[in-house]
Structure formats: structure tokens, C-alpha cells
Amino acid sequence: MHLLIPAAGSGRRFGADRNKLLLPLLGQPVLAWTLQAADQAQSITWIGIIGQPGDRADIEALVDQLQLATPVSWIQGGRERQESVFNGLRSLPSGAQQVLIHDGARCLATPTLFDRCSAALQTCPAFVAAVPVKDTIKQVAADGTIAATPDRSTLWAAQTPQGFTVESLLRCHRQGLEQQLAVTDDAALLEAFGLPVQIVEGEETNLKVTTPADLAIAELILKQRQFTAAIA
């Protein structure tokens, strides 16, 4: 399975002047945890890291340091995530038919999740890893008043990996760029053009590191995993 990792994370919310994926998390950069999990997954045979020129030297040095068994390629990103993924799709190895897209900031994804997602793509053409929403969600109007309370039983929180056939996702990205359609994840592109996308069970711990609080929570989860592994 081919895996694309968008890795152009801003450090703005951390008060940092560098990519948040290069910030330290329990002794190594955030991105290192993502790469190691993907490398340990039995199904992942190629990894493409999509980033910005200013981060290339640091990320390539990290890849060299990790000595991953899986081949890793650097791919030049675009101005926005959507354009970056499009560049990644066009840079896949010749003959690639299926692809997983995984945010580099979701550094707690496990090898088991990558393998489960790869297996799901063999039976459905497009999917999103997701978990059921636990909180009551309120739809709020522009003036701050509650407009609606959706039925929680129908709501899922989308994560990554998200999986697709290369042909369908590339076609939707081209159409999306032509129509200047802005989306927040790749599945939304397929949805916009009427293509079905299914849900695959994600992981509760598969959070996206966006704020300093997320980084602290991620460290606690990783410490717990290390403790559990040590006493097993």
C-alpha cells in the first residue's frame, strides 16, 4: 500500500517559528512517531512525505536517522493542503492503484490502524477512518444562538488515514481545482462529486496534534504505551 503524509504543519498555535511536526515529543520529533508507526505496518510498502522546501533538510535528516525499512520519498507541497495532496498523487510510483492519505500530525496512529485501513480498501473504493462522536454537538448560527442539535447517533469524527483508488481521487482533485472547490479533507472531494465514501473504525487515541494541549496529551498516551509494553 502507498501512503502519502502531508507534513506542512504550522507552529503558529505553539508560538513556534517552525513546523509543528518537527517539535519534540518524548525525545523525538512529532513526525518521527508517525513515520515509525507506518514503517511497522505490514501493509505499507512506500511512503511519500509532502512538505515545504524550508523543512526538507530537517525531514530528510530525520528519515535518515530513523533508518526505516520502508522506502521514503520527498514530495514538494503546494500552497494549501489540497494542492499538496494533488502533488503527492502525481508523484506516486508508476502503477500505484490505491493510496492512503494520513496527516503527519496524527502521530498516535498505530501500525494496526494502518493495516486495518489497507485491508478495508480491498473491499471498498473509498473510506475514512473515524470514531463515533461522544459529545452532544450543537449547530450554531452566526449570532451565537443554537440553530439545531443533530442526532449524535449519526455523527462520526473523521480522522486519517483515508483511503482511495488513485484514479478516483486524482480525478476529483483535478475537478476540485478546476472548480476552485475548497475542502478540509480528501473524502469531502469525493462526496462533492457524488461518490460514496464509507467509514472504517478509527482509534480514540488517534488525535491530531494542533495545540500545546494536544502535544501534552500525546505525550501521556505514548508514555502509557511504553509502560504497558515494558510490563508485558
Swiss-Prot record:
Its EC number is 2.7.7.60. The record marks R13, K20 as: Transition state stabilizer. Keywords: Isoprene biosynthesis, Nucleotidyltransferase, Transferase. The record marks R152, K208 as: Positions MEP for the nucleophilic attack. One of its GO terms (biological process) is isopentenyl diphosphate biosynthetic process, methylerythritol 4-phosphate pathway. It comes from the Bacteria. Pathway: Isoprenoid biosynthesis; isopentenyl diphosphate biosynthesis via DXP pathway; isopentenyl diphosphate from 1-deoxy-D-xylulose 5-phosphate: step 2/6. It catalyses: 2-C-methyl-D-erythritol 4-phosphate + CTP + H(+) = 4-CDP-2-C-methyl-D-erythritol + diphosphate. GO terms for molecular function: 2-C-methyl-D-erythritol 4-phosphate cytidylyltransferase activity. InterPro entries: IspD (IPR001228), IspD/TarI (IPR034683), IspD/TarI_cytidylyltransf_bact (IPR050088), ISPD_synthase_CS (IPR018294), Nucleotide-diphossugar_trans (IPR029044). The keyword Nucleotidyltransferase applies. The keyword Secreted does not apply. It is an enzyme of class 2 (transferase). Belongs to the IspD/TarI cytidylyltransferase family. IspD subfamily. NCBIfam families: ispD. Catalyzes the formation of 4-diphosphocytidyl-2-C-methyl-D-erythritol from CTP and 2-C-methyl-D-erythritol 4-phosphate (MEP). This is 2-C-methyl-D-erythritol 4-phosphate cytidylyltransferase. It comes from Synechococcus elongatus (strain ATCC 33912 / PCC 7942 / FACHB-805) (Anacystis nidulans R2).
